[in-house]
A protein has these predicted regions:
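Specific aromatic-rich, kink-prone transmembrane helix
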Residues: 47-48, 154-173, 205-206, 378-382
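Periplasmic/ER-lumenal interhelical loops and adjacent helix-loop junctions
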Residues: 225, 230-315, 339, 424-459
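Short hydrophobic alpha-helices at membrane interfaces in multi-pass membrane enzymes
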Residues: 166-190, 220-227, 398
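Membrane-interface helix-loop-helix junctions at transmembrane boundaries of multi-pass membrane enzymes
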Residues: 216-226, 309-350, 394-398
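Hydrophobic, aromatic-rich transmembrane alpha-helices
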Residues: 235, 297-325, 333, 337-338, ...
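Start-transfer (signal-anchor) and selected internal transmembrane alpha helices
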Residues: 1-28, 398-407, 465-491
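Membrane-helix boundary/interfacial segments in multi-pass membrane proteins
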Residues: 45, 141-155, 257-264, 338-378, ...
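Active-site lumenal/periplasmic loops and adjacent helix-entry segments of GT-C-fold
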Residues: 25-122, 126-161, 190-197
Length: 492
């Protein structure tokens, strides 16, 4: 909200550009019904079920893996942020209205956080706005919101720019208002409370950049930052991690069963990255149906076009700029290419999942297509880097033509997809509990927290609260000391 207020106060057109990005991508939410997606009924039942439990004094911390579907449908998605629609529902608001309001909030967060990360990474507002459009209009993300209603994954995607912001600052040796270790702890905590699957995928850019930029991230201060972030994350999320550990131990057979099911056949084709216009279909079984009625997964034609334009500039010798060691673009780009490889159905996932470690790591994922997330991040950063380099090496007119073309392609393809979803998906009219379909939720007592919880659970909650309070006090005291040090240095 502070970002929006600052842009309004400055009278900057950036606010209206971001508002346009938001309105374009959130178009299917401005109706009085829900689009009938593959998992929207599940999510509506989830809200109503949480409301009933909360009325009885029980908070469901996370959703267990629905093994009946042979994949991790909302598996280990946290319910902390779902308190927003649940509390609105408890005030008497219509069920589908609170669901759409929740999605509107998620999309607004995606726009704000992605702009912040890109603006700090490239120090150019125009580039950041274009990058925000590319990130927020990615077909995979729009399909997660409206096609599959995989809200946990969409929520994790919205918070992922916080992790990217940490990487931008760490690689560039920049400092913000928050300490680096706290920023990383917040990023991991947000992903953990959103989706376990996105948390695992989000760790891929972090681990990859730690190896790629080991001089910046794995020096003495870097190890200290990672250690403090890990300790803060464990302490502040102990109330959540302890029940999850108990669940994984109690239902290890379920995890092993789901983790051993066919997974590779649900991977994407390379053609998904090259297709310009999707029909907004609902088919995710690409091995059996190919592209017939395929869902709109991919990075978008604008990012694909920028990638091939980059290759042409590189091989033609028109782009001679070398990447700086303090620029995170190159590392995220190579990580994005790795994400493309991991998302394909030709990657030997089924062979790897014969190992128990890979079964545990991937049992909460629905398909390899979730690795499109780092692919989108990497291509967005390299695309923004290309726009910056092109602006420096070419005339203002040529740079403006390229930027306009990128935005036009992204806008037209997004309009095509959202309109296809609106025109092709049947409306789902659900106002009250009686309108809900018969969807059975898998319950796990390990995830139910109430006043009658055991001593271990209450102790974990107390430690987490004390940890959060302690970190806040530490940051306040640290910020007070820094101005004093600056004053002393200036006086000296």
């Amino acid at each position: 909200m502070r970002i929006i207020e600052k842009m309004k106060l400055k009278g900057n057109s950036t606010f209206w550009c971001l508002a346009g990005i938001f309105l374009t991508g959130a178009l299917p939410l401005f109706t009085n019904y829900c689009l009938n997606s593959s998992e929207v009924s599940y999510q509506l039942v989830r809200i109503e079920n949480m409301k009933d439990y909360l009325s009885a004094g029980i908070f469901q911390m996370a959703m267990p893996v629905n093994w009946q579907y042979e994949h991790g449908t909302a598996g280990l998605d946290g319910n902390l942020f779902w308190l927003l629609p649940v509390l609105l529902r408890m005030t008497g608001a219509a069920l589908e209205s609170v669901y759409r309001m929740f999605l509107i909030c998620i999309y607004a967060v995606t726009v704000c956080f992605s702009y912040k990360a890109l603006e700090e990474g490239f120090q150019n507002k125009k580039t950041a706005v274009i990058g925000t459009a590319l990130y927020c209009w990615a077909p995979w993300y729009l399909d997660a919101l409206y096609g599959r209603a995989a809200i946990g994954e969409a929520l994790g995607y919205a918070f992922l720019p916080v992790l990217l912001l940490f990487l931008v600052r760490a690689v560039g040796r920049k400092k913000g208002k928050l300490p680096q270790w706290l920023l990383l702890a917040i990023a991991i905590s947000l992903l953990l409370q959103s989706s376990f699957a996105v948390l695992e995928v989000g760790m891929l850019p972090l681990v990859f950049c730690c190896v790629y930029y080991r001089r910046q991230l794995l020096e003495k201060d870097g190890w200290l930052t990672l250690g403090k972030a890990a300790a803060a994350t464990l302490l502040c999320n102990l109330w959540y991690l302890l029940p999850m550990l108990r669940y994984l131990v109690a239902y290890r057979d379920v995890a092993k069963y789901v983790g051993s099911r066919p997974f590779q056949e649900k991977g994407a084709f390379l053609l998904h990255y090259l297709t310009f216009f999707f029909q907004g279909g609902a088919t995710y079984d690409y091995k059996s149906n190919g592209f017939q009625g395929t869902a709109a997964i991919g990075v978008g034609p604008a990012l694909t076009g920028l990638f091939f334009f980059l290759l042409w500039l590189k091989f033609s010798g028109a782009l001679q700029k070398k990447n700086s060691k303090e620029d995170s673009t190159a590392g995220l780009f190579w990580c994005g290419l790795l994400g493309i490889l991991l998302s394909l159905g030709s990657f030997p996932w089924d062979l790897l999942r014969q190992n128990a470690v890979f079964q545990v790591l991937t049992f909460s994922m629905q398909s390899p297509a979730i690795f499109m997330i780092p692919a989108i991040c990497g291509l967005t950063f390299i695309g923004c880097g290309l726009l910056n380099a092109y602006r420096e090496g070419k005339s203002a007119t040529e740079a403006t033509i390229l930027e306009t073309a990128v935005l036009a392609v992204a806008f037209v393809s997004t309009q095509f997809l959202t309109n296809k979803l609106l025109l092709g998906r049947a409306p789902l009219w659900i106002r009250q509990k009686e309108d809900l379909p018969d969807v059975v939720l898998i319950e796990a007592p390990q995830f139910q927290m109430s006043a009658a919880a055991g001593a271990a659970q209450l102790g974990a909650v107390a430690l987490s609260v004390l940890g959060i309070v302690g970190i806040v006090i530490y940051c306040i005291l640290t910020q007070k000391k820094d101005p004093d040090r600056k004053v002393r240095k200036e006086a000296a």
